[in-house]
Amino acid sequence: ITDLDRYLFGKYRGKKIIDINTPLNYKSFVFSNTIIKRNILDDAGTFDENMSNYGGEDTEISIRISKKYSQGIRKLITAEAYHITQKTINQYIENMFEYGKYNFYKIIDKHPSYKNDLGYLWINSIKGNMLFNTFSRFMCKTLMKLSHHPLLIKFLVIDAFIRGAKNKF
């Protein structure tokens, strides 16, 4: 297991233990390990092909599925999934920059009521600028030389997303 795997599938990214009878909300979908019935995709639609850059296509389809099946999407106890991450931490961080730059606003345009829930308020807010800036990024990268703690990775991932969103198009 890599440091990136520990971040992606650990508690600091928001890993939740979900009861079998609890409906999944759109934030709980991780499409690299998800099985969706064909009739649900036929009804909600497939991935948005206008999202040609990295990221957000899974979030966008999750929103559509959650809107149509708010009580119907459940965890399948018998399904087993194994996921091997092929990326480095730096590659993933670069992917999140690309997501913020190219696809985040496409999701917001299609689903404006979700913008605050998706982190829009952090992009140009005072609190976002105070927390995510050149100095804090430098400090975090310096600390990463000592430890690849998942919270440091999380900070750099969010920072990359915000920088990408500020540099859209």
Can you annotate each of these PLM segments?
Residues I1-R6, S70-G72:
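Conserved donor NDP-sugar-binding/catalytic core segment of glycosyltransferases
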Residues N39-D43, E80:
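Short, well-ordered alpha-helical scaffold segment located
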Residues G72-Y82:
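Catalytic beta-strand/loop signature of glycosyltransferases that borders the donor
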Residues I17-N39, S52-Y54:
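A recurrent flexible, glycine/aromatic-enriched loop bordering the glycosyltransferase active site
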Residues N53-Y54, Y82-K106:
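Nucleotide-sugar-dependent glycosyltransferase catalytic core
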Residues N53-I61:
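Acidic donor-binding loop at a coil-to-helix junction in glycosyltransferase catalytic cores
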Residues E98-Y99, N116-F169:
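Non-catalytic, C-terminal membrane-associated alpha-helical segments of glycosyltransferases
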Residues I65-S66:
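Hydrophobic residues within well-ordered alpha-helices
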